[in-house]
């Protein structure tokens, strides 16, 4: 980020958002490669025969070609082979578009720095902790017990490429850059090959995914502007959780305020945050809108959103992409968690003189549970257990050393505990831990051609101490024990900021 600021100094005010000249600079392509945002799939890499090194020679020739008059535009009638570069036209376009993707991200990056500085008093957070998945943590921490209905929205995709260009007009005021963007989209790409909607979310072609993910995220940000306006209008206090680049940075402020309050040894639950009218979050091409309104009100919201997106964004959108579910009757499959609102019954005996009464109270509680059936299915797919959850050995790992086998099983177990540490009930995790531990023992016994009992008796129980690390010891390495009440909060539910995905359990083959 420092490199970007060095090339965009404030004294160049006349060139604010004037990004087109940067595409002729070699350092832009070096920064796009060195920042590692697309390190594993960078099109600026040589062919496999050249040891995957950055080809500055191709970049140099490309920039020289762009400087030449009337040679930048490539006619669609040209052959696929470009004699000057020695590569096909698709690679020629991808090289420019990757550098262009890095350039158009500059205004957003500077805006993010400005937003973070004003929010936390000039404190800049590391970019790897600003992933979109972190929006799910404060979303699950919100009070859902009073909410009634949830709208499941499948985010529409643009039906015309010009919509993507128009979305950036408010951010990039450089007409030349917008014309270049329009040239890429209309000359080199076909919408049917860019976006495929066979799955619930969206997937892009493997060619230069970073460029099109940036365009898609910018487009989705504009769609979400509706919820930002409605949220601010419906709240008594001005919301600070829907600023620039919403759903990214505000978990920090929330956890710091929790620490600040509980460190003072308050023994009561405080409503630290206002009770909003709507709760909104987006994930995997979907979005969820929870509200405490009636079914009639949610149905009006549904048709309002459909009409708004159709008229304002010219989207091919129909009501079947929005489903209304009652929160108390449906469990939400949300980012690997099974979330639901259930009633906790409690019975109180009260006695007045000679008469006694039984009072039944039902309190709503929002639970984030570990889905046991999908997890056992993943373990069965990875040959750790049967479909019924009975542990079995993993023969493909029997050729490894004992330490490698234990390390692999232990890594899977730690990752699962790490990811599902925010669950309100961890009983399921200990069942998964038992399956992995016994599967590890059977794999080791298979390797040494003995039974599990004989192997453990000969090797000792210390061999599997990898699975005996208590949750409290892991948490003590992450959070200081500021007070007893604060430690009680940490023991119940913890959200780790270094999580950005959960990998398939069958990765190790």
Curated annotation (Swiss-Prot):
Gene Ontology cellular-component annotations: chloroplast
Alphabetically ordered keywords of this record: Chloroplast, mRNA processing, Plastid, RNA-binding, tRNA processing
Biological process terms in GO annotation: mRNA processing; RNA splicing; tRNA processing
Keyword Protease appears in the UniProt entry: no
Localization in the cell: Plastid, Chloroplast
Disulfide bond residue pairs: none
Stored Pfam families: Intron_maturas2, MatK_N
GO molecular function: RNA binding
PANTHER family per record: MATURASE K
Function in brief: Usually encoded in the trnK tRNA gene intron. Probably assists in splicing its own and other chloroplast group II introns.
Similarity comment: Belongs to the intron maturase 2 family. MatK subfamily.
Protein name: Maturase K
Species of provenance: Nicotiana acuminata
This protein's encoding gene: matK
